[in-house]
A protein has these predicted regions:
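Short glycine/threonine-rich loop-to-helix capping motif typified by GTGT followed
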Residues: 52-61, 235-241, 279-302, 329, ...
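Beta-strand segments within the central parallel beta-sheet cores of soluble alpha/beta enzyme folds
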Residues: 39-48, 68-71, 98-103, 152-159, ...
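Conserved catalytic cysteine-centered active-site region
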Residues: 47-101, 105-124, 128-136, 173-199, ...
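Condensing-enzyme catalytic core mediating Claisen C-C bond formation in acyl metabolism
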Residues: 1-17, 156, 187-256, 306-320, ...
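Conserved active-site and cofactor/substrate-binding residues in soluble primary-metabolism enzymes
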Residues: 18-26, 53, 77-81, 93, ...
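Active-site-proximal alpha-helical scaffold in enzymes
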Residues: 74-104, 133-167, 207-213, 326-349
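Conserved active-site "lid/cap" helical segment
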Residues: 1-77, 143-150, 172-181, 191, ...
Length: 379
C-alpha cells in the first residue's frame, strides 16, 4: 500500500514567547485544517521532541479521543522517525489517517549533552568531541583534505542558505550575507565561521497522511510518499557522538538510507527536481550531497559554483534556507524538510518556488549518534 500526504502545518522557526508544546499544537491544527479534517478523524499519531515536552501529551489540547499516540526520539532524526512510524501504521492497515508531529524549544547556545546518554566515557567529552562545532569541523577538515576541496565552498553554501532564508516567511534568519562576508566572519572551529552553522531554535511541524487511494478521493493536491528509509551507523563510520575512527572510513548512515530510499522509490538522484539536505553546518551539506548520490565525492564545486543548487538551478537544494537559515528545533526539523518539498511539489512555495512544476523531491536528515532518514516524494 502506498502512502500520501494530504495536509501540512508549520509553526515558524526562531525564538518565541510560547512553549514548544504550543508550537506543536499550532502546527498540528494547521495540518489538520490543510487536510480539511479535525482531530477526531485521526486514528493514529506519532510525534517527538527533545526539550519541548512529551508529544503524546498534546492530546490534552487536541482532544481525548483515545487515539494511539506513539512518542519517538532519534536526535535530529526525530521528525523522520515520527513520519516513518505514522506511514507504517497506514501501510500495515492499523490506521486510515495518521498524523506525524514534531516540535522543540531549545535553550540558547550549543546543545549540552551528557556523554553517558550515548554510552560514551567522560574522556570523549573532555577531548571536546561532545561540542558539535568541534566534531563537525574535525570531520570536515579531513574530508576537504581527502578530496582536495576549497574551504571557500562552505561560504558559498551558507550564502545560498541565507539568500533562500531571506525570502522564506517561516525562516529565523532573514538577512542575506555574501560569501565574502561569511568567509570573513569570526572563526568558530576551523574551517567553519559563525554564519556557516545552524543554531538550536524553536518551532513545530506536522503532516497528515493516508493511503494514496484514499488521498485521491479527498484532494487533488496530495503528494505521494514514495519512500521513507531510516538507518543507523555501521562499524567503522565516523559519526557525531560515536568515537569510532577506522583507518578506512565506512560509508555512513546517510549513504545507506538514501540508497534504500531511491531503490524503494524506483528512481535515482538524477530524477529529483528539488531536495532538502541536512546542513547542520555548511560542511554537512557539502558531504551529504555526495553521500546521497547527487555528485561524486570531490565534485561538489561544479554544483556549488555553477549555481546548480540555487532555486533556479538544475537541482535546487534547501530552498527554504535549510537549517542554517531556520535553525534546528530537533523534533520539527526533519518534518520541515518534507513540508518544504510538499509545498514545492504543490506549487505553494511563494517567492522561493522552484520553476517548471517540479514533480519529484528528496529529503535527508542526519543526527546523533550516526542515524539518517531519507524520503522520496512525488506528484
Amino acid at each position: 500500500m502506498s502512502v500520501s500526504i494530504i495536509g501540512v502545518g508549520l509553526h515558524p522557526f526562531g525564538r518565541f514567547e510560547i512553549s514548544g508544546r504550543e508550537m506543536g499544537l499550532i502546527a498540528a491544527r494547521e495540518a489538520l485544517a490543510d487536510a480539511g479534517l479535525t482531530w477526531s478523524d485521526i486514528d493514529f499519531a506519532a510525534g517527538g521532541s527533545r526539550d519541548g515536552g512529551h508529544a503524546d501529551a498534546l492530546v490534552s489540547e487536541l482532544g481525548l479521543t483515545g487515539v494511539p499516540f506513539i512518542s519517538v526520539y532519534n536526535g535530529c532524526g526525530t521528525g523522520g522517525s515520527a513520519l516513518l512510524t505514522a506511514s507504517q501504521a497506514i501501510k500495515s492497515g492499523a490506521a486510515d489517517i495518521a498524523l506525524a508531529v514534531g516540535f522543540d524549544k531549545h535553550a540558547r547556545g550549543a546543545f549540552a549533552t551528557d556523554p553517558g546518554e550515548y554510552g560514551l566515557p567522560d574522556w570523549y567529552a573532555e577531548a571536546g568531541m561532545m561540542v558539535t562545532t568541534q566534531f563537525f569541523a574535525l570531520k570536515l577538515r579531513r574530508y576537504l583534505d581527502d578530496y582536495g576541496l576549497d574551504a571557500r565552498l562552505l561560504a558559498e553554501i551558507a550564502a545560498k542558505a541565507l539568500r533562500n532564508g531571506s525570502i522564506t516567511p517561516h525562516a529565523w534568519r532573514r538577512k542575506p550575507f555574501t560569501a565574502d562576508e561569511i568567509a570573513n566572519a569570526p572563526m568558530v572551529n576551523d574551517p567553519l565561521t559563525t554564519y556557516m552553522f545552524c543554531s538550536p531554535s524553536e518551532g513545530g511541524a506536522a503532516i497528515v497522511l493516508t493511503s494514496t487511494e484514499r488521498a485521491r478521493e479527498m484532494t487533488d493536491r496530495s503528494v505521494e510518499l514514495r519512500a521513507i528509509e531510516f538507518r543507523s551507523r555501521q562499524f567503522g563510520t565516523f559519526e557525531v557522538f560515536s568515537p569510532s575512527l577506522a583507518p578506512a572510513i565506512t560509508p555512513g548512515a546517510t549513504v545507506d538510507a538514501s540508497r534504500a530510499a531511491f531503490e524503494s522509490a524506483g528512481i535515482g538522484p538524477g530524477e529529483i527536481d528539488v531536495a532538502q539536505i541536512q546542513d547542520t553546518e555548511a560542511g554537512a551539506e557539502l558531504m551529504h550531497l555526495a553521500e546521497c548520490g547527487f555528485c561524486e565525492h570531490g565534485e561538489q564545486a561544479k554544483l556549488i559554483l555553477g549555481g546548480e543548487l540555487d532555486i533556479n538551478g538544475r537541482i535546487p537544494v534547501n530552498t527554504d534556507g535549510g537549517l542554517i537559515a531556520n535553525g534546528e528545533p530537533i523534533g520539527a526539523s526533519g518534518l520541515r524538510q518534507v513540508i518544504e518539498c510538499v509545498r514545492q511539489l504543490q506549487g505553494r512555495a511563494g517567492d522561493r518556488q522552484v520553476p517548471g512544476e517540479p514533480r519529484t523531491a528528496f529529503t535527508q536528515v542526519y543526527g546523533a549518534p550516526g542515524i539518517s532518514a531519507c524520503t522520496v516524494l512525488s506528484r
